[in-house]
């Protein structure tokens, strides 16, 4: 009889930034501007790569895919968050929460494997420069992209299914601004040891394995660079990897802090702050890190702007 009388959770109350009630409108304006800027910068990068044939190379192919990923990644979270900031009723349905978690994990996990593919691309460019165009043909690039998406789909499907098969009979107050794994698991009626298992699975398949692949690529890259006799040549060669290394460092630092650390040492407000950094800020800065440091891309952008606005000049 006790089980029958329990109320099944059909929606979650998204508390998010409720502790900052007086700043809701200010946060809305800030996050809206950041979101629009993210969409704009990534759209510019994608269109420049598509329109300029000089950028039709494996490295820029992956950069365009990365920008597409960032747009989708933020679209899953930010619009709903903006609506909640201005709404009195800050809720999300049970199904909507599951869809949001699946989508977020899919794009986030695919992003990790995409970074591994980009590391492999840098390895092939530096260690096999003469055969690079053959070894990294269109078919190989498409295959790496498909593999990244397949891995992301598997991780997100398994993890989301396991989480939402748990019984939810207790509180429905979600202490976060979107349906991330840990905040949702805290609301499950039974999850003894299960939360650690799910997070471990996510960490291994979506973080540890891609990171190991990246490390293997860079061990070989560094080994090849050290064989270059000129210090100028070594610096110039390694500089082609600098942007990728910065993005990898930021991505894995934030993700590891959220998913691979002991949960008892940090509050939900600290989790929210870190989550803002990797769901809103990194999608804005990642493509910019790649493009602004790249002279070839900046030249292509100037050509594209010139051909678009001054076609007859």
UniProtKB/Swiss-Prot annotation:
Residues 1-25, 76-99, 161-197, 259-271 are extracellular. Residues 47-54, 121-139, 218-237, 293-313 are cytoplasmic. The keyword Ribosomal protein does not apply. The keyword Cell membrane applies. InterPro entries: GPCR_Rhodpsn (IPR000276), GPCR_Rhodpsn_7TM (IPR017452), Olfact_rcpt (IPR000725). One of its GO terms (cellular component) is membrane. Gene3D superfamilies: Rhodopsin 7-helix transmembrane proteins. PROSITE patterns: G_PROTEIN_RECEP_F1_2. It is found in: Cell membrane. Glycans are attached at residues 5, 265. One of its GO terms (biological process) is detection of chemical stimulus involved in sensory perception of smell. It is a multi-pass membrane protein. The chain crosses the membrane at residues 26-46, 55-75, 100-120, 140-160, 198-217, 238-258, 272-292. Belongs to the G-protein coupled receptor 1 family. This is Olfactory receptor 10K1.
């Amino acid at each position: 009889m006790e089980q029958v009388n329990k109320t099944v959770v059909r929606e979650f109350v998204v508390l998010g930034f409720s502790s900052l009630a007086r700043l809701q409108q200010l946060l809305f304006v800030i996050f809206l501007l950041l979101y629009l800027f993210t969409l704009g910068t990534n759209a510019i990068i994608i269109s420049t790569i598509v329109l300029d044939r000089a950028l039709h190379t494996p490295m820029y192919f992956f950069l365009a895919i990365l920008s597409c990923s960032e747009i989708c990644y933020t679209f899953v979270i930010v619009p709903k968050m903006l609506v909640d900031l201005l709404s009195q009723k800050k809720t999300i349905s049970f199904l909507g929460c599951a869809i949001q978690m699946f989508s977020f994990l899919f794009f986030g996990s695919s992003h990790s494997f995409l970074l591994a593919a980009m590391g492999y691309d840098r390895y092939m460019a530096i260690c096999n420069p003469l055969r690079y165009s053959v070894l990294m043909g269109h078919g190989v690039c498409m295959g790496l992209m498909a593999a990244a998406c397949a891995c992301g789909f598997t991780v997100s499907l398994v993890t989301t299914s396991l989480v939402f098969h748990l019984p939810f009979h207790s509180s429905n107050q979600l202490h976060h601004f979107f349906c991330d794994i840990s905040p949702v698991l805290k609301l499950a009626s039974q999850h003894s040891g299960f939360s650690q298992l799910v997070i471990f699975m996510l960490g291994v398949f979506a973080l540890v394995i891609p990171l190991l692949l990246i490390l293997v690529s860079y061990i070989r890259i560094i080994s090849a660079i050290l064989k270059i006799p000129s210090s100028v040549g070594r610096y110039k060669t390694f500089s082609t990897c600098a942007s990728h290394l910065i993005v990898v460092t930021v991505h894995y630092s934030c993700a590891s802090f959220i998913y691979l650390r002991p949960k008892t040492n940090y509050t939900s407000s600290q989790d929210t702050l870190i989550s803002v950094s990797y769901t809103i800020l990194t999608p804005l800065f990642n493509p910019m890190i790649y493009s602004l440091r790249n002279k070839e891309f900046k030249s292509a952008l100037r050509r594209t702007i010139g051909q678009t606005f001054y076609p007859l000049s």
